[in-house]
Amino acid sequence: MKFFALFIQRPVATTLLTLAITLSGIIGFSLLPVSPLPQVDYPVIMVSASMPGADPETMASSVATPLERALGRIAGVNEMTSTSSLGSTRIILQFDLNRDINGAARDVQAALNAAQSLLPSGMPSRPTYRKMNPSDAPIMIMTLTSDTFSQGQLYDYASTKLAQKIAQTEGVSDVTVGGSSLPAVRVELNPSALFNQGVSLDAVRQAISAANVRRPQGSVDAAETHWQVQANDEIKTAEGYRPLIVHYNNGSPVRLQDVANVIDSVQDVRNAGMSAGQPAVLLVISREPGANIIATVDRIRAELPALRASIPASIQLNIAQDRSPTIRASLDEVERSLVIAVALVILVVFIFLRSGRATLIPAVAVPVSLIGTFAAMYLCGFSLNNLSLMALTIATGFVVDDAIVVLENISRHLEAGVKPMVAALRGVREVGFTVLSMSISLVAVFIPLLLMAGLPGRLFREFAVTLSVAIGISLVISLTLTPMMCAWLLRSHPKGQQQRIRGFGKVLLAIQQGYGRSLNWALGHTRWVMVVLLSTIALNVWLYISIPKTFFPEQDTGRMMGFIQADQSISFQSMQQKLKDFMQIVGADPAVDSVTGFTGGSRTNSGSMFISLKPLSERQETAQQVITRLRGKLAKEPGANLFLSSVQDIRVGGRHSNAAYQFTLLADDLAALREWEPKVRAALAKLPQLADVNSDQQDKGAEMALTYDRETMARLGIDVSEANALLNNAFGQRQISTIYQPLNQYKVVMEVAPEYTQDVSSLDKMFVINSNGQSIPLSYFAKWQPANAPLAVNHQGLSAASTISFNLPDGGSLSEATAAVERAMTELGVPSTVRGAFAGTAQVFQETLKSQLWLIMAAIATVYIVLGILYESYVHPLTILSTLPSAGVGALLALELFDAPFSLIALIGIMLLIGIVKKNAIMMVDFALDAQRNGNISAREAIFQASLLRFRPIIMTTLAALFGALPLVLSSGDGAELRQPLGITIVGGLVVSQLLTLYTTPVIYLYFDRLRNRFSKQPLMKLE
């Protein structure tokens, strides 16, 4: 009593406390970063190694395997996957979520150092690593185009000037340049001219390397002057290399220009980028973990004038994709929902209490509780994102509950003629324990969620903490500010202006009287009520089993990714044309705003596209509907497939795939894997629950297989290393020298001229000069024939692996898809030597699916324990928890009605319902117990009176929670697919539970009271 009086009788102190909470919240709000979802930093490290010209199998056996053995010993590695393709190996290490990324990076560096001695000596550089976050998509993509500058020059400007400046922008972590490669001097050899002059390819390489060196020449100290010695030991342009003497033939010099075409070009001619139908260089910008996306994008945009001024005017620098507009729009929609929810909740209070002054009290309490939460969010390192703002929207219905319970009880005393100060003290004392029980038991629901491991736990931690803090602040406000305002603002016997809306009071009274009659019947027919309750429990089980399930709602971020997979033997020139054709088809769709793409590099038959859709206000279709529409048009393109998927803010796993979900086949025997992968892929492609089924197993690439005649080689004085060097020099785009410039370093690249690299018959023109100076054609000691070879070799752990990727058809669910895949594997009879397992998002979904029921049970158990402690009873918590089955039925039926799958968002809605619907029972049980202890009446009479007495606050709090969630159900625009499942679950659960628990709770109370009387004759204890 004294505690409450302290705040009621000291209005200035209470007001200043409220202002302090509000001001701290406003400051916290201004400092909070902005992002689409809570930051989940998966500790992922990518190791890269290169050996230009090496085939995938060589890269896998000589580079990937030694590295995997060393890296596999690192503690905390959850998954290790590798892809070896032409000249490169990429290894992805995914660590435990709790592993420190910096410590993991040190371990990776140590492992790379240990493996260095096991790697081939021909590697141009040591393996490197970088940290990465697979779930963090680029925040911006820029393009450089020009009618006058070459692609190499554009790439040079992009990497040397623009990327450096952009990377220095606050919030930017990495800028990747693609679509071409750095400028280089290319030496395109003519095999016929070399043969005629008697010059070997390796002699040309050695001559170029020896002619371009950078070594210190020292200095000279004269008597009065210090002289630096500088020689023209470097050649920096193609023009400088052309007259270089590479050989003497009968005393006459053979110059490089006599046997080769020397041009200024690029390091890798098999790289191409496109934007808006013309060649382009791409700048892909990523943010730092936890950085404010909107602020970072704004900073980059502010730098655009300076960036454009730093490059020639004939180069166009444009933004092809910007992630911030959809984030801004989505957060604006959530904030709008929050404001609407607050307004609706306050309207509920006004309708029921019919007093402007009384309505003012929750109108102050609700914003203060919500605003104060921002301070705690900032201190916890959270961000303003869809989930944290959804938590505040839902919290609107929760935080007003405490104020409503206190306000309604005080108003009841005022209506009875009690003076305001006395009514405030008496009213808050009567319901103080009730409010405390409601708040603590509601927060207890989130304890299992806070302890949940893995991605879901990290993802919803902000949601749970934000909601819990809002409830905690609301508890403080409802027990301090609310009674103080009641004492100083409200009056006994309110009259006057409320007469005009008194009609609603009559309606409410009539409803209450009707409820009293129906409750009286229910208490007289308890068996029928119990049948209904047991039926809801059974219906819960059936609905949960039958409802389609998915991991996370399919988002429409306004961005799509396209992955091209062409015939494995396709040439680079044909691949460029495929990219252009696909970009034209996609760009012609009315919902598409821009398309940017690139192809080349180590994957010769693949390409990628970044697609931006028009804002939702300018298109009628969702991203998934656009994909479905384009799928039919894209299927008509021969020789290649384009797989489209909507970019999601949540992505799990570091492996590259052409679709959203992955199923990986593992085998110790590569032959068994190659035998069964096509069978499994064909079976999965027939499943209607899957779409865009494809595989990363590409073992049908065209290869010219050479067989050396070692006896002939020994007789001719040629060893295998010389023959291999010949092929590498001719076809490997071999980097043979480095050109040092003030801002960058460039390469001298040697291979045969393009007309020879595009025709396998050029092998007939290759030759080696043996130790006797004789020119020996390759055909003298080698035979070759066409064969198939892998374009990539994939490992998971130390096993050969092949990943089958798939998307979901429009309206499909992940649970149906995974179940169909498992059935197909069983029906195929795949041997035990070939193992299948879901990977990435599909794997996390299956793990989450197994833990969902345990999570719900843990939440119920936690609430039971908390209520048992609060009520000093084993039985009364069960009475309160009997409200849950009806809420579950309502939530699941609502999801079925709206054709929404059961996702993690819906699971959170169920968790919230556990906390919400028990409030009704708490209010009933509290007053019934108090009446039994102090009024000396029967349990039936006590629960009947409590139900009628608390009918108005029960209806008010339920409607407040319902209206708080209603804006989420009715939301549209960006991010609605995240908000709607939560709102649907809560509204459906509230409606059904409100109808049933008004009857089931009193009946359960009676049953347990009879049970208590049967086993114990002691009267109820009075709890102080």
Swiss-Prot record:
Keyword Transmembrane helix listed: yes
Classification via InterPro entries: AcrB_DN_DC_subdom, Acrflvin-R, Multidrug-R_MdtC
Protein name per its UniProtKB record: Multidrug resistance protein MdtC
Pfam families per the UniProt record, alphabetical: ACR_tran
GO cellular component, one term: plasma membrane
Gene it is expressed from: mdtC
Record-linked HAMAP family: MdtC
An MF annotation (GO) of this entry: xenobiotic transmembrane transporter activity
TM region positions: 12-32, 333-353, 360-380, 387-407, 435-455, 469-489, 528-548, 853-873, 875-895, 897-917, 953-973, 984-1004
Signal sequence bounds: none
Organism expressing this protein natively: Yersinia pseudotuberculosis serotype O:1b (strain IP 31758)
Gene3D superfamilies on file: Multidrug efflux transporter AcrB pore domain, Multidrug efflux transporter AcrB pore domain like, Multidrug efflux transporter AcrB TolC docking domain, DN and DC subdomains, Multidrug efflux transporter AcrB transmembrane domain
Subunit structure: Part of a tripartite efflux system composed of MdtA, MdtB and MdtC. MdtC forms a heteromultimer with MdtB.
Similarity section: Belongs to the resistance-nodulation-cell division (RND) (TC 2.A.6) family. MdtC subfamily.
Tagged with keyword Flavoprotein: no
Compartments in which it is found: Cell inner membrane
Membrane disposition: Multi-pass membrane protein
Keywords: Cell inner membrane, Cell membrane, Membrane, Transmembrane, Transmembrane helix, Transport
